[in-house]
Amino acid sequence: IVKNIQKDKVFLENSVIESESIFWTAGIQASPLTQSIDCDKDNLGRIIVKEDCSVPGYENIFAIGDLTNFKPKNNLSKKYETLPGVAQVALQMGKHVSKQIQNDLNNVERKTFNYKDLGEMATIGKSKAVVDIMNLRFGGVIAWLIWLFVHLIAITNFKNKLMIFTQWFWGYLTSQRHSRIIR
């Protein structure tokens, strides 16, 4: 059991681990919303969805994103047993579910959700990020600029892009940590 963490040490009950890098991954749990639906869930409380993102036993209810445990069968990346609870998964699932609802209204057969892995990236400090796209892995300032560009492009309209960019820029100048939050 971890008792305390400092910059370069982790204190356990009977020992100390010294390290230059400490990563805390204490686990996650699905939203309490999932508890209101009587269906199969995994050990994290995520809804186990069917191939079309519908909830078994509730054909007119869909679940997407980090509420779900989706086991891809035909995805190209083959690196996930279940899809991660990240934005690109939720966005792709959302588009898929929108099409499924249209198909239902037009009496068209539902299709299987196929996730397309667009890569991964994360900011890891001021002017620093890591990027893994198409088996290219790199970090630093270039990765950070790519992260900024990709996330600004994903924002829906020019006014929002300008507002977010302005907040990020001000946050960068003033060293505010929350400056990389996307709303």
Residue ranges, per PLM feature:
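C-terminal, flexible cofactor-proximal segment of oxidoreductases
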Residues: 98-183
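Glycine-rich beta-alpha junction loops
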Residues: 2, 21, 25-28, 125-128
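A conserved short coil-to-beta-strand element within the FAD-binding core of flavoproteins
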Residues: 1-9
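FAD-site-proximal beta/loop scaffold in flavoenzymes
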Residues: 8-93, 99
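Conserved strand-loop elements at the edges of beta-sheets that form or border functional pockets
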Residues: 4, 55, 115
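Proline- and acidic/polar-enriched loop/turn elements at helix boundaries
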Residues: 1-2, 35, 46, 165
